[in-house]
């Protein structure tokens, strides 16, 4: 195709071939495998060579209508040059936007696609104003805040009894006062001996009648003489001590003592 005096050749063609016979590239077959020319070549009424730059994006059925708007607004030669400077993986996006801009320019020769941009911006402004109005309306409809409940009085904490700390070795007195050097330990043993002897004598006095063979009749007679039990008991004690070989203690009573016959 001749566009502006330059022949358009591109790499990576396909999708459509040149109609009417064999082609120099492809061994006598058509450039697109016998499917007919691409939409761009069909609109331009030219032979679609293998590697046509428009073939991947404009098919032979509906591509002619889209390419007509592109050619009218931008020109086929300018679009082919633009696509050659774009990476292959981004050319599809470029073709879509070019077609959109071309159709918008045909519908609105003054603003083109900018008219659509202005309409979207105005829509955003209207939506923001509506959101602000709704927020203010909701703020006026909010229920009053409930009254804060009085804080409960803090309950008195129970008093816990703190046990005294355990005694340690350090709590003991540093020194213990020793016994006086003049203290006579023999007196302790003498007192212990005398107390044990006294306890032994008391045990002997528990039942003197059985120990010394005194009959119950004679003892009862002796105790009952004169009707004075205290003097009889005292006399009996003197008699028993005399039999054991101990001198009887001095009598404290000046009344005459009664003795028992052996």
Curated annotation (Swiss-Prot):
Q: Decide whether keyword Nucleus is in the record.
A: yes
Tissue range of expression?
Answer: Expressed in roots, stems, leaves and flowers. Expressed in vascular tissues of hypocotyls, leaves, roots, developing floral organs and siliques.
Record's Pfam families?
Answer: LOB
Tell me what turns on expression of this protein. Answer: By auxin.
Partners and quaternary state?
Answer: Homodimer and heterodimer with LBD16. Interacts with GIP1.
The primary site where this protein sits is nucleus
Describe the task this protein carries out.
Involved in the positive regulation of tracheary element (TE) differentiation. Involved in a positive feedback loop that maintains or promotes NAC030/VND7 expression that regulates TE differentiation-related genes. Functions in the initiation and emergence of lateral roots, in conjunction with LBD16, downstream of ARF7 and ARF19. Transcriptional activator that directly regulates EXPA14, a gene encoding a cell wall-loosening factor that promotes lateral root emergence. Activates EXPA14 by directly binding to a specific region of its promoter.
A GO BP term, please? callus formation
Organism, by scientific name, is: Arabidopsis thaliana
Location in the cell: Nucleus
Which superkingdom is the protein from? Eukaryota
- All copies of domain LOB, residue ranges: 36-138
Region Disordered: start-end pairs: 223-262
Q: What is this protein called?
A: LOB domain-containing protein 18
- Check the record and name the InterPro entries matching this protein: LOB (IPR004883), LOB_18/20 (IPR017394)
Record key words, sorted? Nucleus
Question: What happens when the protein's gene is inactivated?
Answer: Reduced number of lateral roots.
GO cellular component terms given for this protein? nucleus
Other comments on record: Plants over-expressing LBD18 have a dwarf and bushy phenotype, with short petioles, curled downward leaves, ectopic shoots from the adaxial side of cotyledons, shrunken root tips and disorganized columella cells.
Q: Which family does it belong to?
A: Belongs to the LOB domain-containing protein family.
């Amino acid at each position: 195709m001749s566009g502006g005096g330059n022949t358009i050749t591109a790499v990576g063609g396909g999708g459509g071939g040149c109609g009417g016979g064999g082609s120099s590239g492809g061994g006598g077959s058509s450039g697109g495998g016998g499917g007919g020319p691409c939409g761009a070549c069909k609109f331009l009424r030219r032979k679609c060579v293998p590697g046509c730059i428009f073939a991947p994006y404009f098919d032979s059925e509906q591509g002619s209508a889209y390419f007509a708007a592109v050619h009218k607004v931008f020109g086929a030669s300018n679009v082919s040059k633009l696509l050659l400077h774009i990476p292959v993986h981004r050319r599809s996006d470029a073709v879509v936007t070019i077609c959109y801009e071309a159709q918008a320019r045909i519908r609105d020769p003054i603003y083109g696609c900018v008219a659509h941009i202005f309409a979207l911006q105005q829509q955003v402004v209207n939506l923001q104003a509506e959101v602000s109005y709704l927020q203010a309306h909701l703020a006026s409809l909010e229920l009053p805040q409930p009254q804060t409940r009085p804080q409960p009085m803090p309950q008195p904490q129970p008093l816990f009894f703190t046990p005294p700390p355990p005694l340690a070795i350090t709590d003991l007195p540093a020194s213990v006062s020793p016994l006086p050097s003049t203290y006579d330990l023999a007196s302790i043993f003498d007192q212990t001996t005398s107390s044990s002897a006294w306890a032994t004598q008391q045990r002997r006095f528990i039942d003197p009648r059985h120990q010394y063979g005194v009959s119950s009749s004679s003892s009862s007679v002796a105790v009952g003489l004169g009707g004075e039990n205290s003097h009889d008991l005292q006399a009996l004690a003197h008699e028993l001590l005399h039999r054991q070989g101990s001198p009887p203690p001095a009598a404290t009573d000046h009344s005459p003592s009664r003795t028992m016959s052996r």
